[in-house]
Structures are given as C-alpha cells and as structure tokens.
Amino acid sequence: MFDITLSDDLTVNIDGTSEGTQTKFYDKGYWYKTDTFEEGIVEYLVSKLLTFSTLPKKSYVVYEYGKINGKSGCRSKDFLKPGYELITFERIHQRITGTKLSVKKFEFESTESYIEYTVDFFRKYLDLDIKKYLKNVFTLDFITLNEDRHFNNLAAICDTKNNKYLTAPIFDNGKSLLNGNRSYRPAFSIEENIKKVIALPFSGSHKKMFDYFGKGFSIEIDSALEWLNTEPQSLYRDVLIYQLSVNKNLE
C-alpha cells in the first residue's frame, strides 16, 4: 500500500474518459485517482483477480490501493508509449460520424444488432477487430458486476506516427462489486442485491453480453479464493468471493 503527497499542479483534467468525478493526478509515470466512493479498493481487487487469469498482463491495467494526500485511492502505471494516444470508443465514433456511439442505441431493435454495428464500425474505419477485446471485457464485467462500462471506458490506442490502432488494456473497474450501486441494501443478501445490478453499454444485462461474445478467459478460482481469504473483510471482497463461487463452472 502506497502513501503519497501530490501537489495541485499535478492534477489532470481528462474529458470524456469515465464517469468523471474522481480527482486525477499524473506524476513520474503513474496515474493517481482519489476515491469518490470506494473505487480504489475495488480497482485493486478486480485487477488483482486478473493476475489469476489466463489473460496476458499487457491486456489489463494493474491498480495499487493506497493514500493520496491523505485520501484513499489508487494508482496505475502509464501504459502509453511515446507517440501513442488513448482514444475512447465514444470519442472515436463522434470524431468520424459527429454522433455519440451511446445514442446510436436507440436506432437498433436488438442488442445484437447494436453490437454488430459497433464491431463493423471499428473494422471499417480503423481496421481494428474489437471482438476479442469485448469478449474479455464482458467476461470480466459478468464476474465483477461492473455498472460503469460506458463507451468512455472502452478505448483504442492510436500509433499516431503510423496511424494504426490497437485495443487498450482493460481499465476503470471501480464501479464493480456493488460499489456505487444505488439500489444496494445492507439488510439484503449479496444474492438479492446483485439482482439489481444494471450493465452497460449494449444491454442492461451482463449475462446477455457475456452470452453473445462467449467466455474470454479462465480464472484459477481456487487460487483466487485463497488470496481473497487473506484480504481484509469488506463488502467488495465478499461480493467477489460470492461471484467466483457461483461461477466456478463458467462456460
């Protein structure tokens, strides 16, 4: 766990990259985010979970939990090389068409057609296949119950010198594990509370998106549970334990 003091001149304002209320800093190759709710511990738990998965380490951002100017939060290493730019799906679509990808939803009669439009769009305009990326993202979100996977939390990386694109590592998982869920009731069981979770961006159902793309990766469940049992008790730890336990045979 880190503990750092950062001056205000290191604050960075980034438009259109997430729900957007966390204070962000950049210093010596690290991004820092202070908590609005309890995003830091959730980011840590979710990214640590992925170290027990079959995903390559370059395909997700690893977050550390700690203190920033006395407040809880998290940090992660800058994954962009010089000459590379992170551009969200929302911004890419708006640059090319003048319309937000999120509002295109109302033009389609089904989740499937909305997904197909999005996949085809990135293939056509960026020569980028995003299917594997989305398969991995929605496998993770199905397990961790991410409720903030809007199109500013999905992104591509542009090699500005060669004008080529690749998918970004998975980032921004802080609104997972019932964190920030406005329907959460402490008196209800985890099983009851997760019934109220609403997914993004193609459907309100995590299962529907998972079923469309299929399983993106596997997790060493027993090893992950062994690790979680060493973590301090919290709602988020308990939700993750529950989700791993009920999805042991995820296919």
What do these predicted regions represent?
Residues 1-101:
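Conserved ATP-binding subdomain of kinase catalytic cores across diverse folds
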Residues 1-13, 22, 42, 124, ...:
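Regulatory N- and C-terminal appendages and interdomain linkers associated
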Residues 4, 12, 101-106, 199-200, ...:
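Hydrophobic transmembrane signal anchors and adjacent membrane-proximal interface regions, especially
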Residues 35-36, 161-251:
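C-terminal catalytic region of ATP-dependent kinase domains
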Residues 61-65, 106-109, 198-204:
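Short C-terminal domain-edge/linker segments immediately following a structured domain
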Residues 72, 83-85, 158-160, 177-179:
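Short catalytic/ligand-binding loop motif for oxyanion handling, primarily in non-cytosolic enzymes
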Residues 79-138, 246:
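ATP-dependent phospho-/nucleotidyl transfer catalytic cores
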Residues 112-177:
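Conserved kinase catalytic-core segment
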